[in-house]
Amino acid sequence: GCAGFTILFVGTTGEVVVVGGGSVGLDVVEYFAPRGAECTIVDMLPQIGMLADPITKCSMRETHDKYGVKEYVNTALQEVKENAFTVKLPDGTIEDLNFDLGFNCLGMRANNPILVQLEEAFDNTDTFIYPIGDSVRARRIMEGTMDGRAILNVLDARGFLDL
């Protein structure tokens, strides 16, 4: 995923292709489009930013219209190449979307390969294992933010935030 991307980008006429029209994908486009990149955003859903709140949707539409962002909806990622994403268009056509910078901002599957071992290793100790984010299940940024807040509450309750 793209969450927390940090890139120094001064400006270019290069191609930026983003796969995933959720919050993070929209943030990537919002960063690069005003800096001169030719942006394309791809999503499997019938609308870019479909799950976004109304204010985000309005801002997105304004940015995409102002900077000529190309949108591919009902379009599925098939392959990631060094300088292109291969996608399947709604009519079944396979197409390469070439990029100078490509971002995979898809919702992913939960990834917690060592969670059981960690829980076993720290069983009967005062260490609490608290799975968060996509280690629990693939989900939205808001839920990850709520997890972060819950962790702060646990740390505060145990006195670890008293600085």
PLM regions and their residue ranges:
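Conserved N-terminal glycine-rich FAD pyrophosphate-binding loop of Rossmann-like flavoproteins
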Residues: 47-61
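Rossmann-like dinucleotide/flavin-binding elements
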Residues: 1-51, 89-163
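General small-molecule cofactor/ligand-binding pocket signal
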Residues: 70-72, 130
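A conserved short coil-to-beta-strand element within the FAD-binding core of flavoproteins
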Residues: 73-84
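Helical element adjacent to the flavin cofactor pocket in flavoenzyme catalytic cores
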Residues: 60-69
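Residues that recognize and position ribonucleotide moieties
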Residues: 70, 78, 95-97
